[in-house]
A protein has these predicted regions:
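A solvent-exposed interaction/effector surface
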Residues: 1-211
Length: 211
């Protein structure tokens, strides 16, 4: 049975649809940076997803080839995630999607080293005849956060964010979005296959204790 991060780490990937406080450990990701409206058909965001999955599946299927990764075990590729921000804006203004910056990412198993990642980029470039140079090995130490499961349209997320911020303040915390800590989304549903009213997205914000 392949290891499924969503099931083994439910506290990170399957929170309740009410806010909670959680400490997120440092994790390694494959990531692509970009900007622009995520709904744009030929935009940077949609392009980033193809690049990420090209590398993710090269690593996942590596055991069938000659490159052996030490400690490898079979696993389900973790869900797509995104860090989002807009310059000079605390949080996100959903009406200004064209101003959004993002780091699109997929979690790597702990056994994948930077050298394994670099091998995967070379392998995918060679096999798929595609440029994967935008993909990077991205360690992210997220730390203390408030998070909540959002069900429904991405455009309705502000209501969930308001609940999170009310809960955060009631428990003695304040928002800590900075140049290195971001609005974070984890996409548990495929919008191409799921009705918009049933989309599941983990929304996560960095916080700190109120002084």
């Amino acid at each position: 049975m392949a290891f499924d991060y969503k099931k083994e780490y439910k506290e990170f990937y399957m929170p309740k649809n009410k806010p909670g406080i959680i400490e997120i450990p440092k994790m390694n990701y494959i990531a692509v940076r970009g900007k622009g409206n995520p709904n744009e058909e030929n935009g940077e965001y949609k392009s980033s997803i193809g690049l990420l999955y090209g590398i993710a599946f090269t690593i996942k299927m590596s055991y069938k080839g000659t490159h052996k990764i030490e400690g490898f075990f079979e696993y389900v590729v973790p869900p797509l995630e995104g860090l989002w921000w807009q310059e000079n804006t605390q949080g996100l203004d959903y009406a200004r999607k064209e101003d959004m910056h993002f780091i699109s990412m997929i979690r790597l198993p702990d056994f994948v080293t930077k050298e394994d990642f670099e091998w995967a980029v070379q392998e995918a470039t060679k096999k798929k005849m595609q440029d994967f140079s935008k993909v990077e090995f991205f360690p992210y130490d997220e730390g203390l956060c408030v998070q909540c499961m959002h069900i429904g349209s991405y455009d309705d997320e502000p209501a969930t964010v308001d609940l999170m911020h009310d809960y955060m303040k009631a428990n003695g915390y304040e928002l800590d979005i900075t140049d290195t800590r971001y609005h974070h989304e984890i996409y548990l549903s495929d919008p191409r296959k799921c009705d918009v009213s049933r989309l599941k997205t983990v929304v996560r914000h960095p916080i700190r204790k109120t002084e």
